[in-house]
């Protein structure tokens, strides 16, 4: 998503060594004014999305410094007051309508798509989904699924029933042994969040969505049942 906006900001491209303070200030101004794609109503980018895009660009420039493509990160010359401010008061979650829109929006990263939707319907953290193995999911004589794990973050053991919607978004097991990870190959949390933005934009959702949004979504759905 960041690359798409950089291409729209400078259609003819720019050499890495020519990315300076002026270029970055112009990009910040572009982010403030540009309209969301795939959205019926004309809306500018959410301030949290602007913040995230700039953070991603900073990371890329830091990598360029570490790889000796450039000597300094020009982002360090930008004053904090000139950067988009993250709105920390909001705890975004997906409404049922938005979640349904995501469910019906195809995406090239099928594994991440399944993992995110699975989290929406069961509430597991990204770190627990990455560690999840087929042996952690058991079925009783009635076909009801129960997930039992020790949470990575809290070290607490939990057991929770899996609804049919959660089970629907599990990958196809095939002949995988019980010890194999359910979501084998799922990328890191940071990378997952970068990729999620593309899917959310395709679905026409304007909220700042990260993998953790799935937990908020699940918690909100539980409160409304």
Positions of the model-derived regions?
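Short basic/aromatic active-site micro-motif
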Residues: 19, 51-52, 186-190, 206-225
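Conserved tyrosine-mediated DNA breakage-rejoining catalytic core shared by Y-recombinases
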Residues: 77-82, 122, 131-172
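C-terminal catalytic core of tyrosine-transesterase DNA break-rejoin enzymes
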Residues: 66, 117, 121, 127-128, ...
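N-terminal DNA-binding recognition helix of tyrosine site-specific recombinases/integrases
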Residues: 2-22, 36-77, 125-127, 198
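Amphipathic, well-packed alpha-helical segments that form the structural scaffold of globular domains
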Residues: 1-8, 25-32, 58, 79, ...
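Exposed loop/turn and edge beta-strand positions of beta-sandwich/beta-sheet ligand-binding modules
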Residues: 44, 88, 112, 143, ...
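C-terminal catalytic core of Y-nucleophile DNA break-rejoin enzymes
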Residues: 88, 151-171, 177-198, 210
């Amino acid at each position: 998503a960041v690359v798409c906006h950089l291409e729209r900001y400078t259609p003819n491209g720019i050499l890495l060594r020519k990315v300076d303070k002026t270029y970055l200030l112009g990009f910040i101004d572009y982010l403030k004014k540009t309209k969301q794609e795939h959205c019926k109503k004309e809306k500018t980018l959410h301030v949290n999305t602007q913040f995230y895009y700039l953070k991603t660009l900073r990371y890329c420039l830091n990598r360029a410094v570490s790889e000796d493509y450039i000597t300094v990160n020009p982002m360090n010359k930008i004053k904090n007051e000139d950067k988009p401010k993250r709105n920390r008061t909001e705890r975004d979650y997906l409404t049922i309508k938005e979640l349904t829109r995501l469910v019906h929006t195809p995406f090239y990263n099928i594994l991440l798509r399944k993992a995110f939707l699975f989290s929406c319907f069961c509430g597991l953290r990204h770190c627990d989904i990455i560690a999840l193995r087929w042996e952690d999911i058991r079925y009783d004589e009635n076909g009801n699924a129960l997930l039992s794990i020790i949470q990575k973050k809290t070290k607490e053991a939990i057991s929770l029933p899996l609804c049919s919607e959660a089970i629907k978004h599990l990958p196809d097991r095939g002949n995988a042994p019980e010890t194999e990870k359910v979501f084998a190959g799922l990328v890191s949390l940071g990378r997952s969040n970068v990729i999620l933005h593309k899917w959310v934009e395709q679905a026409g959702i304007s909220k700042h969505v990260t993998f953790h949004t799935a937990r908020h979504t699940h918690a909100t759905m539980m409160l409304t049942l």
